[in-house]
């Protein structure tokens, strides 16, 4: 491992070619599936997660309140998917086949090969 002028071990140099954008490829794990968010496929399941019966403390650090009904959720999901600077995914429980939540890959900086996982 390389050592700097202070005698500290440092990592190997990283290739400086720009990173590539993520793809919305489906990823299957032991307990969950990650797939591209779809209004048609996931909205009804997500109402249980983001709807009016959701515990209020779940929303402490989020920028929006829970939705009141399915129609409001559909509008919100469509607005999310219109964004071209984020990649939205649904998290699916393999045992039930139901969507348990969502996340996005955002603040993508290809030049510095960084990405943030968020809401």
Residue ranges and their predicted role:
Residues 1-119:
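GNAT-family acyltransferases
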């Amino acid at each position: 491992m390389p050592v700097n002028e202070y005698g500290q071990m440092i990592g190997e140099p990283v290739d400086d070619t720009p990173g590539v954008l993520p793809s919305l490829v489906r990823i299957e794990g032991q307990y969950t599936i990650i797939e591209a968010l779809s209004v048609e496929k996931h909205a009804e399941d997500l109402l249980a997660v983001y709807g009016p019966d959701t515990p209020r403390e779940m929303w402490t650090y989020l920028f929006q309140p829970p939705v009141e009904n399915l129609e409001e959720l559909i509008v919100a999901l469509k607005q999310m998917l219109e964004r071209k600077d984020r990649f939205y995914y649904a998290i699916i429980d393999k045992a039930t086949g139901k969507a348990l939540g969502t996340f996005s890959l955002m603040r993508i900086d290809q030049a510095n090969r960084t990405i943030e996982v968020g809401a």
